Amino acid sequence: MSNDRLNSMRFMVWLATPLMWLVRPRVAPAENPAKELGIDPAKPVLYVLPTASLIDRIVLYRHCKQFNLPTPDFKPRYLGEPGKAAYLYLTKLGLLQPLRDNNAPAPLSDLVARAQSDKNLEVQLVPVSIIWGRDPARREKSLFKLVFADDEHAGMIQKVLIVIAQGRDTLLNIGKPISLRQQIDSQEDNSETARKLRRVLRVHFRQHRQVSLGPKLYDRAEVIGEVLRAKSVQQAIDRESEKDPGNRRRIELKAQRYVKEITAEPTHGVVRFLRAVLHYLWQKIFHGIETYHSEYLRDLAEKYEVVFMSCHRSHIDYLLLGYVVFEHGMVPPHTAAGINLNFWPVGSLLRRGGAFFLRRKFGGNRLYTAVFNEYVNFLVRRGHALNFFPEGGRSRTGRLLPPKTGMLAMILNGYVRSRTKPIVILPVYVGYDHVVEVKSYLRELQGGKKRPETIGQLLGARKLLRKRYGKAYVNFAKPIMVDEFLDQQHPSWRDEDLSHESKPLWLSKTVDELAEQGMCNINDAVVVSPIALTATAMLASPKRAMAESELLKFLEVAIRIISEGMNFQSGTISRTDPKDIVSFAEEVSSIKRFKYPGNDVLHLNEADAVVMSYYRNNIIHVFTLPSLIANFFLYQEEVSEQAILDGVKAFLPFLKREFFLRWSDDDENQFIRKTLHSMTDNGLLIHIGGSSPTYRRPIVAAEEYGLLKTMAGILQTILERYGITLAILGSF
């Protein structure tokens, strides 16, 4: 019987092949669903779909094949063998609409009864929803959208029309498995288990749709009206009118122009267009995009309003993060972009892709400040995901810049006033093997004037497509739950009536702390890329040159030391094979090879060394402890462990501030000792036991001594700068 059903399913999949040409779904999670979601192939799987749909089931079947997941061949009554999978519909469809029934479907009730009688039966319930068309639409619907837009309550006839219209804009959501055994064991009244499961699954489906589609879109007239009616904006208009009572209408029109200048106008059609363009662009200029810790993105989005807090390396950051979020089945965030990007045609495209624009300086313009603040409050109240760059502008040096807290203060102020869906701050590390604008950064650092963004620059950017820029890296850092953070900083915030107060007195200090924590989390999520690692080694060596064998050995040792003593919980090392790293660095960067019999030499000329310092600065904080410890041995053969601890702790307050490191006293002692042990295990130091533990450097003629000097060279110029500063201060 089961073989007949299996053959029948395969026949239906084959029969539907022409129809599937219209269907090109993206899958969330996109890379390895079984691993990311924790689906155990050794246990039976029951895929649960919200409504009965043969097309949905065929789409699921095809993609289970693609990702090596168990295929839904059977109905639940045939389920039981390891590696087998079945399917279940929570709701059956009538001709025009679903058949409403508050009871659990009979197959689910039967499966629960089987599991209650058979204690060895363990089934994984995997909720699956297919979103036909990712357009969140506006609050009012056209006739076309009423018929062709995805509707979870669509009947069979409407579903066919939806598939025809939306097949190329489809999202297949696969949820985390729910343990049937755990649900049964946790329920005292077994008769209610099936009903409870049905409710749990419905919540999953509702959250899937919410994350995938986001809030309803707004139009310009709606946002203009809501912002201008806000009390804070009306007060700002009143203040301006007091100076010139006869021109209130002119001031109101000025406020309206500000709203139009600021407001995003997201359109799903433009988002899809940008996604297609960016997909082509990334393939042309990058070897790939590496994304880390994206597996908890959707979990966060289901429970919180996500505010992305990203470091800023390049103009590409705006597009890259939105692209990554969209590819993971979520709505791209509203992104705060500089007004310098609001030029034709880029400004219009970015605005319709979800960017809103802000001036670099508000310059005491209280009316503009009130309008911008109220627009941010509007987005927070509506539940839109946000993205902003706390540094305020692109880093010209490769290091994180001190945060500018204005945007974060507006977001936090809007949240404590409106008390909407809980907010999570999600810091994001963005890095590149080659930053497109790096040469213009160097020109500006040398005193050159920043060139304004223009259409001419855009046309000139075509030459970028002729080059390859290595890889791009996006790492999602440890999230900061705003409610928990506020509870720690100001426990009574929930009890205060802040709805009419423009800005609580305690908010400024809290925002500063939150910004500092966010920056620390960004650096904690560092991606140690091949280019950055090679640049760090080359720039720390004398004359910016290293024999290939020496470079390979240093990379091997450095990778082991920072891996074993990795004090960065969210950080990662992109590549760990030294030969692979050097080969990739030669291909992408400006490192030159000079061939010599027996041992080639790799070299950076002076101009290229300045460029490579940008990439070294991306990861220099990873070497804080090993490089600082190595510097104690440049002029001393032996140093006691206690002297090392005291010396490192004397410098750490300065380095922690400069590199955004947030380590407690206990962490510092643990990290220092861990680094000492790792340096000893890798031959850079020699441990001498006894009542007073001591460390000795290798003999000068040893290869390991050269590696120790290179390790020390990473921070040497920074430590010399501290020394010069202290010497000058001491002379007064």
Predicted feature residues:
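Membrane-interfacial terminal anchoring regions of lipid-handling membrane enzymes
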Residues: 1-732
